[in-house]
């Protein structure tokens, strides 16, 4: 069984292993920079670590591969009988990370 971790970033949690490429909420880091992510849980074979003191020593490191945008989300607000309608779109900014280590 492989080693993996659950990391928290941008208000979401992601399951990552070494070598994974994940898209997370935008981080204020440049391309090629190293980043460290807070860990919520670590699974190493049959050993599951959730203790806060033990997790304080664990670090998940990654490298920023670049920045991108998510899919377009269309918002349409409409009120009946008043002629009010509003169309809006949004594309979330994302950061592409490659996980380089769980230590």
Swiss-Prot record:
For this entry, the protein name equals Large ribosomal subunit protein bL21
Top-level taxon of the source organism: Bacteria
Q: Which GO terms describe its biological process?
A: translation
Query: Per the record, GO CC terms?
Result: cytoplasm; plasma membrane; ribonucleoprotein complex; ribosome
Quaternary structure and partners: Part of the 50S ribosomal subunit. Contacts protein L20.
Q: Which InterPro entries match?
A: bL21-like, bL21-like_sf, Ribosomal_bL21, Ribosomal_bL21_CS
Family that this chain belongs to: Belongs to the bacterial ribosomal protein bL21 family.
Its taxonomic path starts at: Bacteria, Bacillati, Actinomycetota, Actinomycetes, Mycobacteriales
Alphabetical list of Pfam families matching this protein? Ribosomal_L21p (PF00829)
Q: PROSITE patterns in the record, alphabetically? A: RIBOSOMAL_L21
Species of origin reads Mycobacterium tuberculosis (strain ATCC 25618 / H37Rv)
Give the UniProt keywords, A-Z: Ribonucleoprotein, Ribosomal protein, RNA-binding, rRNA-binding
Function of this protein? This protein binds to 23S rRNA in the presence of protein L20.
Q: Which GO terms describe its molecular function?
A: rRNA binding; structural constituent of ribosome
Entry keyword annotation includes Ribosomal protein: yes
Answer whether the UniProt record assigns the keyword Transcription regulation to this protein.
no
